[in-house]
Amino acid sequence: MALKERLGTVVSDKMDKTVVVAVVNRFPHSIYQKTVSRTTRYKAHDEENNCKVGDRVRITETRPLSATKRWSVAEVLRTTKQEKEAVK
């Protein structure tokens, strides 16, 4: 069985070794065909506390690590610092 992966943005890093990642899912409405966006928040394990708010990350499914934590940060795709430099 392949592990599920999601791409998202870190919205909270206030917990120790845990970040909250918001993943946006876009799909057409079943009747009106308008594109609808749904945001799901996942708690993900961050062993070294590397992630900061605003970072783009890839998370992968893992065994249950706590009551609500079933995802782990696989890699940081883009940091907040890199995004600020790209805008300039």
From Swiss-Prot:
Keywords: Ribonucleoprotein, Ribosomal protein, RNA-binding, rRNA-binding. GO terms for biological process: translation. GO terms for molecular function: rRNA binding; structural constituent of ribosome. Pfam families: Ribosomal_S17 (PF00366). The keyword Ribosomal protein applies. The keyword Iron-sulfur does not apply. It comes from the Bacteria. SUPFAM superfamilies: Nucleic acid-binding proteins. InterPro entries: NA-bd_OB-fold, Ribosomal_uS17, Ribosomal_uS17_bact/chlr, Ribosomal_uS17_CS. GO terms for cellular component: cytosolic small ribosomal subunit. Belongs to the universal ribosomal protein uS17 family. PANTHER family: 40S RIBOSOMAL PROTEIN S11 FAMILY MEMBER, SMALL RIBOSOMAL SUBUNIT PROTEIN US17M. One of the primary rRNA binding proteins, it binds specifically to the 5'-end of 16S ribosomal RNA. Part of the 30S ribosomal subunit. This is Small ribosomal subunit protein uS17.
